[in-house]
Curated annotation (Swiss-Prot):
Gene Ontology BP terms: mannosyl-inositol phosphorylceramide biosynthetic process
Entry-linked InterPro entries: Glycosyltransferase_domain, GlycoTrfase_DXD_sugar-bd_CS, Nucleotide-diphossugar_trans
GO cellular component: cis-Golgi network membrane; Golgi apparatus; trans-Golgi network; trans-Golgi network membrane
Function as written in the Swiss-Prot or TrEMBL entry: With imt2 and imt3, is required for the synthesis of mannosyl phosphorylinositol ceramide (MIPC). Catalyzes the addition of mannosyl to phosphorylinositol ceramide (IPC). MIPC is essential for cell morphology, cell-surface distribution of ergosterol, localization for plasma-membrane transporters, and lipid-raft-mediated endocytosis of plasma membrane proteins to the vacuole.
Keyword annotations of the record: Glycoprotein, Glycosyltransferase, Golgi apparatus, Membrane, Transferase, Transmembrane, Transmembrane helix
Glycosylation sites: N115, N198
Name of the protein this chain belongs to: Inositol phosphoceramide mannosyltransferase 1
Amino acid sequence: MGRKCRKLLLKGIPICGVILLILWGYSLYNTLRFMVPGKATEPFTLSLSDVSDDTSAPGEMEKIPRVIHQLWKDENIPERWSNTVNSCRRQHPDENGWQFILWTDEKIMSFMNENYSWFMPVFHSYPYNIQKFDAARYFILYHYGGVYMDLDIGCKKPMDPLLSKATFILPSTEPIGYSNDWFAATPKHPFLYQAIHNLSKFNHRYFTKYPTVFLSAGPLFLSYQFCKYLLTPHEPVRVLPALLYGNGPNSFFSHVTGDSWHGTDAKVFIWIDRNSKSVLFFAFLAAFAILFLCLRVVFKRRRKRGIAASHSQIQELYP
């Protein structure tokens, strides 16, 4: 009886493992299908006609406040970003109701201590300053609403048409995911509530600086949270496609090189991304070679066992 139970367990455990793996894979696919631009994201992706000056419905009210939040360590913005910052100020003047707020390290610490002291142990535990900047932007926009944008993003035209289209807007990135270098929201938006309350769960070191930053509080963290949010009943959210967010003629924005926090590991990941076809080809060859060697070892062992078994049978027949 015990032997039969052991056999059933030996057969059942792998089967259960496969079933659980399939269920986990389906759940992950169901969440991450929103990562890739396509049919899943079409219903809430903004088009050029959505943001044309003459497409606003009569009486359509702006949902998102006319406040632009930006972050830097102090009041002295580097010269390399002066053109982008000034372009946004020109397109969004005070007389049109726009307000600019530059959040320095000192202002961020004061704001966080005063309003979100419960998060400060996690905030102080981040090993890299960029993680603190990433987390702070979520809290600031959750608290005040408005538009967050990095200093290396310039403005080619006013963002006014975007403010009435949804309660939250996030740009998609190619080939997959969403960016956290620009996003817009109403105050106390439920998606940002979800994001800030999940930061502590993702506060881990993921080998090197680049994946740690991206997964703990950066774009991959926000992308995953956004995909999860889309699976639940939610307020109107919209995605800003590359057509309206990239460097093209119809875009609201221009982009210059930023990412001052990138290290050597980031350069490796970026190189892999830019040479993805070659990397996949050589990875396939390596996987095939490893599989071939493993099969060769297995067949050799089986052959040796077969020869040994034959010899033992012969010895039993002819002692």
